[in-house]
Amino acid sequence: RDRSVSRGLGDVYKRQFLDRDDQEMVNFVYKASEVCAKYKMLVDFHGVFKPTGLQRTYPNVLNYEGVNGLEQMKWSSEKEFDMVTYDVTIPFIRMIAGPMDYTQGAMRNAARGNHRSVNSEPMSQGTRCRQLATYVIFESPFNMLCDAPSNYRREKECTEFISNIPTIWDETVSLAGKVSEYVAIARRHGNDWYIGALTNWTPRELDLDLSFLGEGDYTLELFKDGINADRAARDYKKEVIPVPTDRKLKIHM
């Protein structure tokens, strides 16, 4: 590693397939964090147990997996794993422990009943906008784009939106939620607010209270499920609208 540092090679250490939480592996995680801190390297532990506060000792540890991330869709059928319901459960449970490396961002999306586990061309359960919203909902200081580069080149509008979402936040406001049913969160970075909302397989409307914005005029760049999203999950619509003066926003998912 000394040779790599002298050449200026690499700033992020992503360690995969730890797959254990016995004492030996816990010791390894602590030692790896210490060594990476010495060499001023950031760390993302993938395939590891949930966080337990290590990032407070070693702030260079940005992220942990410790979650059934989107990669599960490569080998799990809809019957075997209901990812859509899982996504509106983990913000209330797993995310309490700390950040999670969920590896989202699928551009191939499948409506209910249409998902297939295809290892070479994996797809997500649920809509395209669902994938976008997870970048706001899920706490993750070091985010990923899980899909193939060719898919992102084809989907430039969504890719540009994802790439502009911050990964660290100055303020977080819980807007609505019920475990395993729906969740809506607003997060602020600087002067900009980002709002994400997810539902389970049940279509629903939410009335969001945006009074936290305070006075002034705001413009909302909105990505929402398209009219056919329940059948064609990639269907979405982008709008740019003024935030209502009464600070009430109705969304349909």
Which stretches of residues belong to each language-model region?
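Single conserved hydrophobic/aromatic residue that forms the stacking wall/gate
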Residues: 2-13
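Structural recognition of the beta-strand scaffold that forms the well-ordered cores
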Residues: 14, 43-45, 194-196
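Glycan-recognition surfaces
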Residues: 42-149
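Glycan-recognition and catalytic regions of carbohydrate-active enzymes
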Residues: 147-194, 198, 230-234
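C-terminal beta-sandwich/jelly-roll accessory domains of carbohydrate-active enzymes
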Residues: 199-253
